[in-house]
Amino acid sequence: MATKRSLFGTDGIRGTANTAPMTVEIAQRLGQAAGLYFMRSQNRRHSVVLGKDTRLSGYMLECALVAGFLSAGMDVILVGPLPTPAIAMLTRSLRADLGVMVSASHNPFTDNGIKLFGPDGFKLSDEVEGEIEDLMSQDLSARLASPAQIGRASRLTDAAGRYIENAKASFPRGLRLDGLKIVIDCANGSAYRVAPTALWELGAEVIKIGCSPDGLNINDGVGSTHPETLCAAVREHGADFGIALDGDADRVLIADENGNLVDGDQIIGLIAAFWKQHDRLRGNTVVTTVMSNMGLEKALAENGLELQRTAVGDRYVVERMREIGANLGGEQSGHMVLSDYATTGDGLIAALQVLAVSVETKRPASEICRFFTPYPQLLKNVRYSGTSPMSSPDLAAAKAWADERLAGSGRLVLRASGTEPLIRVMAEAQDEALVHEVVDHVCDVIRAIAHA
């Protein structure tokens, strides 16, 4: 039986580079354990696809993982800086046993992380991650490869081109982006080559920002965590669309031609309504998380569509989609999962679907990207030290008070961050003053608990 996961969080392993768990030693150990776990058959060669984003520490962790996989007897296919969804796609395409992405997504360059994908291109389950952790705690020396069985490392030189073609295949074949001026912000991250190229090949005039990575500037004032940069660039250049990706390009936000931001909820609603009109939305159901706006749920219901919510994290969205057979899901933060085209969140493919709606309907972004009127929503993060306040009776009482105040008109969501000592407090309701009252009170209670 697998032990409780301690290394793996809600999206792989993540932490400060060169500090546990993001050390050379742990990365090498992970490579050995994951390699041995996925080498089920001994009568053929086994392989892993290994990609990364543009962080300086990516070189260090990449080399450590390579050493671990090779010592386990697994061949390594290196693809260099590519989006996370590209690693998932290539793992399936190359019939590899495993895919690995070295990235901390939207975090600053000082952090890094490791995400694992199975041979089907989906993120590993909690159970499999737990079993790999079990292996990491064991003495593996007797199970490592003999000198003749050590793995080989090679580089896939056309990996970027393969992903570009895969992304373009999601765009209707009869359409082009001629006449559209598009600002693309790649967060100085892993999509800095592939995203502008894909848009240009489809006919767009492309203006690039956040496409000059130096190892230290990923997500630094650019990308989906700093959408104000994109919005300003759209206004400056008189562009028709703006697209902001995060460091590993698994999430996307849009700016319309006026430089107004469009979040993930609006993108989900737009795609859902368009797909329903064209009989492409499976089960008339969309999967989102507890953070998605109640306004989206109401608008979907008015269009005859059901919204199902999961815990925060695109992996949980994907799991629910697979359970019920849905083909559209995502998060307010910009993770968009379109399972007709990808097994995980893919910012570029999601952006192409929005562009396709605009081209097909001949309507500007400002018209198509306002699917619903959002309820006033407020999110605050409260940092703590020591024991998490989530199990405190005082916090339970505060939540009960908030639920009573919001009854019938709104909701409160409390969530512990999976990567930082933070409690996220989110409330929404049609009464904005009530939202602020509830969030401020609950945050005050958390602070009091943290300093008690």
Curated annotation (Swiss-Prot):
Family of the protein in this entry: Belongs to the phosphohexose mutase family.
Listed name of the protein: Phosphoglucosamine mutase
Transmembrane annotation, as ranges: none
GO BP terms: carbohydrate metabolic process; peptidoglycan biosynthetic process; UDP-N-acetylglucosamine biosynthetic process
Xref: InterPro entries: A-D-PHexomutase_a/b/a-I, A-D-PHexomutase_a/b/a-I/II/III, A-D-PHexomutase_a/b/a-II, A-D-PHexomutase_a/b/a-III, A-D-PHexomutase_C, A-D-PHexomutase_C_sf, A-D-PHexomutase_CS, Alpha-D-phosphohexomutase_SF
Documented EC number(s): 5.4.2.10
Cofactor section: Mg(2+)
GO CC annotations on file: cytosol
PTM note: Activated by phosphorylation.
Catalytic activity line of the entry: alpha-D-glucosamine 1-phosphate = D-glucosamine 6-phosphate
List of residues that carry Phosphoserine: 105
Role this protein plays: Catalyzes the conversion of glucosamine-6-phosphate to glucosamine-1-phosphate.
Catalytic residues, chain numbering: 105
Pfam family, one: PGM_PMM_IV
Cofactor, free-text remark: Binds 1 Mg(2+) ion per subunit.
First-level EC class: isomerase
Disulfide bonds: none
Organism from which the protein derives: Gluconobacter oxydans (strain 621H) (Gluconobacter suboxydans)
Superkingdom per UniProt: Bacteria
GO molecular-function terms, A-Z: magnesium ion binding; phosphoglucosamine mutase activity; phosphomannomutase activity
